[in-house]
Amino acid sequence: MPNKPKGLLIVVTGPSAVGKGTICRALLAETPGIRFSVSCTTRPKRPGEVDGVEYYFISKEEFERRIAAGEFLEWAEVYGNYYGTPRGYVEEVTAQGQDVILDIDRVGARAVREQYPDAVSVFVIPPSMEALRQRIAARGTESPEAVARRLAEAPEWIREGLTYDYVIVNDDLARAVAELRAIIMAEKARTVRNGAALIETLLEKGALTDE
């Protein structure tokens, strides 16, 4: 029998506070069969965050130990804090044929896309810079200087979105979630349609002949 096909690796990124995490969580809540890779970080928890749900919150020393041990699929330092994607979980789940979503920053997304060219890349953008400013300010965790810095960097982020497979404008959560779901369904259908290699393998093994 042919090997079980690997699951999709879906990379979702976008400017800070664009709402990519909210989109991913909403999709996971109503779409069975998709797994979420929880990243590790050294940044402090924000109000309402739970260890192991939004992130695994670990010390800088522990993070650096895991870097040295090669335990991260990708990692980056962003605004003075480390962020990284555990390698073992992603490789294990996709090998089992399950789809995995990564909600990561653009530096990490770039690293994953280089390692996994077949990954499905999705870039989330705000409907306007004013909407992004309001979302950053609404967090209540950023200083005015930090808000200004993130807004100044946003155009560069958005230009990078030109290299992604798909772009979602997050002006309505339900619509954004529906678009992400449609992207995943289309990609899964595409992998099924591109089944020539499987047929060739079965023919070579004689599974589709009368011999």
Swiss-Prot record:
SMART domains according to UniProt: GuKc
Compartment(s) of residence: Cytoplasm
Annotated binding of ATP, by residue: 14-21
Location of the Guanylate kinase-like domain: 7-185
Keyword Cytoplasm on entry: yes
Keywords: ATP-binding, Cytoplasm, Kinase, Nucleotide-binding, Transferase
GO MF entry, a single one: guanylate kinase activity
Principal location listed in the UniProt entry: cytoplasm
EC number: 2.7.4.8
SUPFAM superfamilies: P-loop containing nucleoside triphosphate hydrolases (SSF52540)
Any one cellular-component term (Gene Ontology): cytosol
Catalytic activity of the protein: GMP + ATP = GDP + ADP
Function, as annotated: Essential for recycling GMP and indirectly, cGMP.
Family (UniProt): Belongs to the guanylate kinase family.
PANTHER family referenced in this protein's UniProt entry, alphabetically: GUANYLATE KINASE (PTHR23117:SF13), GUANYLATE KINASE-RELATED (PTHR23117)
Protein name: Guanylate kinase
Organism: Symbiobacterium thermophilum (strain DSM 24528 / JCM 14929 / IAM 14863 / T)
Lineage of origin: Bacteria, Bacillati, Bacillota, Clostridia, Eubacteriales
